[in-house]
Amino acid sequence: MYKNLLFTLLIMAGMQFLSSCAGCSDSGKKSQGDALTLPDSLISDAPLRLSEEIMNEVIGNISSPVEMAGLFKNSGVDFTQRILNNPDNVSRYETSYQRALNLGVYSADLGYINTFDKNNIVVSYLLAVKNLADGIRVGQFFDFNALRRMASSSTNLDSLMEMSQTSFNKMDSYLREQNRSNVSSLIVTGAWVEGMYIASNIVRESGDKELSDRIAEQKNVVNILEIILSNYASDAGFAELVQSVEDLKAAYAPVRITTELGEPQRIEKDGSLIFIQAEVSTVHYSPEDLENIMATIENIRAKIVN
């Protein structure tokens, strides 16, 4: 589920740099999460321009916060619908910008709902997703009638989420193939913000250390989001969103992530034995740092859903 990422970004006139993963564990355990690391020389106030091809690769490599759903349940905190975006809010979202952002929000909510097997409210969230997808002309990727039938039985929830995820993947691929990566980037951002918002609420209630680390390690993802969104700063709504991400980047500034080489791992691939260099990563932050990050995330989320 959590995989190490190593990919090359070509920026400006063919400049190359590597973005590698950094996990999160103050105890020095092997990385369990994805974090995309930028060299300090490329993290500046000036926006970097990415080609459409590279934008597609970056967006595709940012892990959806839906993948954090297992940590939500492991925290021991009971399911709370009040922290999710109310499906009735769909009528508020009248622009493509709002619809794309909140399509991401509801996708993260669905992951949280599925984790706790709350099939009694799944349909209303699927309907919200369908309405927003129709609003940005990608509703053809969601067979709502089939999804609704599957949602009527708790025994079908795994298949339901698999089908939903397949629909989202097809939709994302279509958007990027149609040179609508600006829309795809909004969906990714909305999903990421909602996942961090849910995680923040759970941390406030439980103090869960693993989730706290997961929030803190997202510093590198924020750097990537800033680059992605800055490419569309001239589009309606994006300038304000970029400013919000810059505020979040400032909140993450005190967080440090250090990485050391661990023992190589042996795996078999295509009949051959290969070695993969493991990494041991540690995230360093104070309770005050975490509180400031969570407060900033909550502020951004409020702007998106209201």
Identify what each model region corresponds to.
Residues 24-30:
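N-terminal intrinsically disordered, low-complexity, charge-rich
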Residues 88-91, 95-98, 110-117, 121, ...:
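Non-transmembrane, amphipathic alpha-helical segments
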